[in-house]
Design a protein with these regions (language model features):
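Catalytic phosphate/metal-binding cores of nucleic-acid and nucleotide-processing enzymes, i.e., regions
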Residues: 1-89
C-alpha cells in the first residue's frame, strides 16, 4: 500500500505503453543487509505496484527489458529512487 501510494503521488496519471528499463538506486542506513536481499524484494514490490497503479501494462519480459541496481549509504534519509527509461516508440 505504501509503495502504491508513493507511485500515485510521484507519477500522477502516467501510463507507459512501450517497454522500459528501470534503474534502481538504493540508499541504505548501514551495510547490515545483503545487497541481493535489498534488491530482490524491492524489484518485486515496486514492479507489481507500477502495474497496479496503471503506470505499466504488465511487468513481464515484453514490458521490462531489464534493470540495474546501485547501492549507497545515507544514514539520515534511507530510500529507494527509480528511473524508468522508456524504450523505442
Amino acid at each position: 500500500m505504501l509503495i502504491s501510494n508513493a507511485i500515485r503521488l510521484q507519477l500522477k496519471r502516467l501510463h507507459i505503453h512501450n517497454s522500459v528499463f528501470i534503474k534502481y538506486s538504493f540508499y541504505e542506513p548501514n551495510r547490515k543487509r545483503d545487497l541481493d536481499n535489498i534488491a530482490g524484494v524491492a524489484h518485486k514490490f515496486i514492479q507489481d505496484s507500477l502495474v497496479k497503479c496503471g503506470v505499466l501494462e504488465n511487468d513481464g519480459w515484453g514490458n521490462i527489458t531489464g534493470f540495474s541496481d546501485q547501492f549507497f549509504l545515507d544514514r539520515y534519509n534511507p530510500r529507494i529512487e527509480i528511473v524508468i527509461q522508456e524504450e523505442g516508440e
